[in-house]
Swiss-Prot record:
Gene name, Swiss-Prot/TrEMBL: rsmG
Source organism of the structure: Streptococcus thermophilus (strain ATCC BAA-250 / LMG 18311)
E.C. numbers: 2.1.1.-
Keyword annotations: Cytoplasm, Methyltransferase, rRNA processing, S-adenosyl-L-methionine, Transferase
NCBIfam families: rsmG_gidB (TIGR00138)
Function: Specifically methylates the N7 position of a guanine in 16S rRNA.
Cellular localization per UniProt: Cytoplasm
Similarity remark: Belongs to the methyltransferase superfamily. RNA methyltransferase RsmG family.
GO cellular component: cytosol
Protein's recorded name: Ribosomal RNA small subunit methyltransferase G
HAMAP family membership: 16SrRNA_methyltr_G
Residues that hold S-adenosyl-L-methionine according to the record: G78, F83, A129, E130, R148
Keyword presence, S-adenosyl-L-methionine: yes
Length: 237
């Protein structure tokens, strides 16, 4: 998917990018490839592949109508090089975006990137989701939490649901169907007072399969969740 194909595909879906937005995506690509030589950010560096498998792929929640350009609080867990939240932020500049990532080098990249792209309303924190999830400044503060290929739902739910306000949504993007994951996560979701409202498979323009799962938070998360760092992965709910 060339940049032009990318812009045209978005336009056909009702998102006519300004020159500034096009420049932001172009500069994002350049910096991603440049920094990737210093720190491991992505295995995908071909321009057409980046525009398809990182940029277009990240925008699925917006293109499908689940995230709109409004001033709400979005948290991205384990965003790595900024996916999916920063492409979403470029498309929806009114969003307030926070990223938590466990690798400080990636946070350094994200700070540099956001300065270069002229993004405002973005915040980057180094640390573990389990620790931030028990911090009152972060717990139950977000309208949406996104996670792209981070962990299976049984684990992911404990890492993300505590950050949501009641009525907020976890939007999880994956490469594979999530049916079995949701079965395995049934107990975790019950314990966390959360409920799946969407589990949908779709295709990228090149035919590659993807999945989007949306979980609603129904009540306040019990205080003991998330458990301390490493436990959710070792002993899933």
């Amino acid at each position: 998917m060339t940049p032009e194909d990318f812009y045209m595909a978005l336009k056909e879906l009702g998102f006519d990018l300004s020159q500034k937005q096009k420049d932001q995506f172009q500069r994002y690509f350049e910096l991603l490839v440049e920094w990737n030589e210093k720190i491991n950010l992505t295995a995908i560096t071909d321009k057409d592949e980046v525009f398809l498998k990182h940029f277009y792929d990240s925008l699925a929640p917006v293109l499908q109508g689940h995230i709109k350009n409004q001033s709400i609080q979005l948290l991205d867990i384990g965003a790595g090089a900024g996916f999916p939240s920063l492409p979403i932020k470029i498309l929806c500049p009114n969003l307030d975006v926070t990223i938590i990532d466990s690798l400080n080098k990636r946070i350094t990249f994200l700070n540099f990137l956001s300065d270069e792209l002229g993004l405002s309303g973005v915040h980057f924190y180094h640390g573990r989701a389990e620790d931030f999830g028990q911090d009152k400044a972060f717990r139950a503060q977000f309208d949406i939490v996104t996670a792209r290929a981070v962990a299976r739902m049984q684990v992911l739910s404990e890492l993300t649901i505590p950050f949501l306000k009641v009525g907020g949504q976890l939007i999880a993007l994956k490469a594979a169907a999530a049916d079995q994951e949701l079965v395995d996560a049934r107990n975790a979701l019950n314990v966390l007072f959360a409920k799946p409202i969407l589990n949908e498979n779709y295709k990228l323009p090149n035919g590659d399969g993807r999945n989007i799962t949306i979980i609603d938070k129904k009540k306040e998360t019990p205080n003991k969740y998330p458990r301390r760092a490493g436990i959710p992965n070792k002993k899933p709910l």
